[in-house]
Regions:
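ABC ATPase NBD coupling module
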Residues: 1-9, 13, 17-24, 28, ...
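Short helical segment in ABC ATPase nucleotide-binding domains corresponding to the A-loop/adjacent helical element
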Residues: 105, 111-124, 134, 138, ...
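P-loop NTP-binding/switch modules centered on Walker-like glycine-rich loops
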Residues: 182-186, 190-272
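ABC ATPase nucleotide-binding domain helical subdomain, centered on the C-loop/LSGGQ "ABC signature"
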Residues: 58-59, 127, 131-146, 153-154, ...
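Short catalytic/signature loops enriched in Gly
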Residues: 74-77, 147-150, 243-349
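A short, proline-enriched helix->beta-strand linker immediately N-terminal to the Walker B motif
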Residues: 175-179
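Conserved ABC ATPase signature
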Residues: 155-160, 164
């Protein structure tokens, strides 16, 4: 029998809220595929042999922000690591799933040396001595591009630039060779030149460490540069899922159209920049129909009444919009994003 708040990864409903308010915020709804490393490496989800060692069994549960250990119910199993207590997350965090956050200025402890912050993670998850951990840390620092790693090992974070701090955060994240690297807007706080360097570093190290990247960003330029597959989210729902080429060449959801139309590179001289009218829906309220309907200039009557299913465009492309229903009127993409590939090449003088 499934326990309270226990849910399967095949269909995830994640709610975050507080008991006192008696409200639940629906953050991620109906994740239609199990969360597997295949997302970026292109593994056939139906191939049992290729799936082994990635996520053989995955069960996730809802966690409330104010939940105490006494209130925990259910279990979470990730790659056969059983989680029944908050302390058990130490088996997962850093070792199997690591995160690179968006602000390198606050990601590091300002009163602990850089070397100590790397070696402490290594020693927590690996049975190695301090000398061995130091050697691994120095090797990581060199791999992420820190010059004079031996001399900079005992420096404090304030002695590093923003780009160098983010390189150290990446080194810490990769210190235990995780299977999944979650990058939450890792280049937002950096200038454009450093952004490109950090993105290249993450992709280059992926080839060596063989990790899956889950990249969270609002920057479509970054998406085009780093992603293999893209999930477009709106109001906590995946509304379009496609290969990166399909998303830019043949987007199907009106929200994706609006996002692409908002690219400054597509704006013409002496014209207003495109913006999406209205505001996103409150996640405290139950959403009826398509959550994008109030802001959708292509809205159909059924959008306000019934939630659309995920329509299949190709074997790798799905979109959640009633416009793909065979009975829907034919709708053309906005003129701004027609031939978007050629327009972007022209904008960047390529």
């Amino acid at each position: 029998t499934r326990k309270r708040n226990e849910i399967l990864a095949k269909e995830i409903y994640l709610s975050v809220g507080r008991y006192k308010l008696r409200k639940k915020v629906r953050m991620i709804k109906k994740l239609h595929e199990a969360f597997k490393a295949a997302m970026e490496r292109g593994v056939d989800l139906n191939d049992e042999q290729k799936r082994n060692g990635v996520f053989d069994q995955a069960t996730f549960r809802v966690r409330y922000l104010d939940e105490t250990p006494e209130q925990l119910h259910g279990t979470c199993i990730i790659n056969l690591a059983k989680i029944q207590d908050p302390n058990d997350w130490g088996q997962i965090r850093g070792k199997k799933i690591a995160t690179v956050f968006q602000d390198p200025m606050t990601s590091l402890n300002p009163i602990i040396t850089i070397g100590k912050q790397i070696t402490s993670v290594i020693m927590k998850h690996q049975d190695v001595s301090e000398v061995e951990a130091r050697a691994q840390a120095l090797e990581l620092m060199e791999k992420v591009g820190i010059p004079n790693a031996e001399q900079r090992f005992d420096d404090y974070p304030f002695q590093y630039s923003g780009g160098m701090r983010q390189r150290i955060v990446i080194a810490i994240a990769l210190s235990c060779r995780p299977k999944i690297l979650i990058c939450d807007e890792p280049t937002t706080a950096l200038d454009v030149t450093i952004q490109a360097q950090i993105l290249k570093l993450i992709k280059d190290l992926q080839k060596e460490y063989n990790y899956t990247i889950v990249f969270i960003t609002h920057d479509l330029g970054v998406v085009a540069n780093i992603a293999d597959r893209v999930a477009v989210l709106y109001a906590g729902q995946i509304i379009e899922f496609a290969n990166v080429e399909e998303l830019f060449y043949d987007p199907r959801h009106p929200y994706t159209w609006a996002l692409l139309s908002s690219l400054p590179q597509l704006a013409e001289r002496n014209t207003k920049l495109f913006s999406i009218t209205g505001t996103p829906p409150s996640l405290y309220n139950k959403i009826i129909g398509d959550p994008f309907a109030p802001r959708n200039q292509y809205c159909l009557k059924i959008d306000t009444l019934e939630e659309p299913p995920m329509f299949k465009v190709t074997d790798t492309h799905y979109a959640k919009t009633w416009l793909l229903d065979p009975r829907a009127p034919k709708t053309e993409k906005p003129e701004a994003i027609q031939n978007i590939h050629e327009k972007l090449l022209k904008a960047y003088n390529l």
